[in-house]
Amino acid sequence: MTPEELTTSLQWRYATKIFDTEKTIAPDTWSTLEESMILTPSSFGLQPWKFITITCKKTKQDLLEHSWHQRQVTDCSHMVVLCARDGMNQKDIDKWLDQLADVRGVSRESLEGYAGMMNGFFGSMDDTQTLAWAKNQV
């Protein structure tokens, strides 16, 4: 599948009910899909998530009972588990701001207004609220 074909496919939404267990996602197509997950936007750009890709048949079988016994879990070639990150804190925000300054080629000081907005947002929430925010990002 070419990148253009992948984009066209992503624009067409469809819930697959039955997977062909004899087929797998080609490595170059999977690589493009992984890159699209990495590039997914989030609030503040913090991306408070982790993607876990499961291809092991035994692991997928073990997850079946936790997935309402939906056969798609065991029949798919690649299963992606989306995880919200718990415990977002000031260190994470500072790390993100340092990375942002580096990528944009600007000083960290030039991002102080943005930093203040982020700190105000997260400073007004407890851990439960921060986790709820992260879950909503996923």
Where are these regions (language model features)?
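Acidic, surface-exposed loops and disordered segments
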Residues: 1-138
